[in-house]
Amino acid sequence: MMRSEPRALQLNEHGQLKHFLTLDGLDKTILTEILDRADSFLSMGEQSVKKVPLLRGKTVVNLFFENSTRTRTTFELAAKRLSADVINLNIETSATSKGESLLDTLKNLEAMQSDMFIVRHSDSGAAHFIAEHCTPNVAIINAGDGRHAHPTQAMLDMLTIRRHKGSFDGLKIAIVGDILHSRVARSQLQALTTLGVSDVRLVGPKTLVPSFFEEMGATICHDLEAGLKDVDVVVMLRLQKERMKGALLPSESEFYRLYGLTEETLAWAKPDAIVMHPGPINRGVEISSEVADGKHSVILNQVTNGIAVRMAVMSMAMSGQLQSDETPAAKDEK
């Protein structure tokens, strides 16, 4: 069976989202629609009743095969604020721990008339595989798959940047740390280039910043000062030791000495630069507490914006499913 192209698999025949698997193939119009819709949801956090009925009567299943705090919780909050019923599958106590295959687990959940799966998995391409094998009327949202993609994280980062900088025009952005193992960096780079940012710098040691990222439109910097010089946005990434094989860096202390973001190294960026981090933060490894908690940090804003972005993506995907000619109901009407 041939693997579907990302754009063809993610959009219905009207060009609307029906799955959200990767930013690869999605154009500026769709990304901007996600940001605009998320902006409209942000004000809900200030209301006494933080709900809208857009997913009322729908069942959302969180399938997290990797540990998560922020992503799983914000997806659950987003679904509940859209009035959906939410099921959090405990993978450790589910039948998958007894040897049941991923596909069999999904087919059983489909039989329970689930409407949307939020999937995090250690294997790259897992969300794509699920979208290809699920019934057409179930929406699949990728909450992170291996090194491949983390599209909702990238979009909440884009919303954070836009809200603090106004637009993406002329911005200089540095992404610092373990680029090699980061699905976040890959999705961020796709989003930034699609939204028109031409100066994106990937900063870190040669072992963690492969040269092939230049083909995606980034500038590679192995010197922190050169990477941070006059940038508007600094995105710090943690060292993903759980994915590392072999000696990719001498030590955490050496990494911090060469690439850690401190008040001194942040001074190389613009005076009004913002500092971002997708979490979890390792203080004293990639970032100092003074910077993480300082006036330039928008890290907690990212978490807040994540709820709104995930509400936007989930509501758009469900709407795209309902308007798709591929749904069983639509086929019955023909």
Swiss-Prot record:
One of its GO terms (cellular component) is cytosol. The keyword Transcription regulation does not apply. It comes from the Bacteria. GO terms for biological process: 'de novo' pyrimidine nucleobase biosynthetic process; 'de novo' UMP biosynthetic process; amino acid metabolic process. Keywords: Pyrimidine biosynthesis, Transferase. Heterododecamer (2C3:3R2) of six catalytic PyrB chains organized as two trimers (C3), and six regulatory PyrI chains organized as three dimers (R2). This is Aspartate carbamoyltransferase catalytic subunit. It comes from Marinomonas sp. (strain MWYL1).
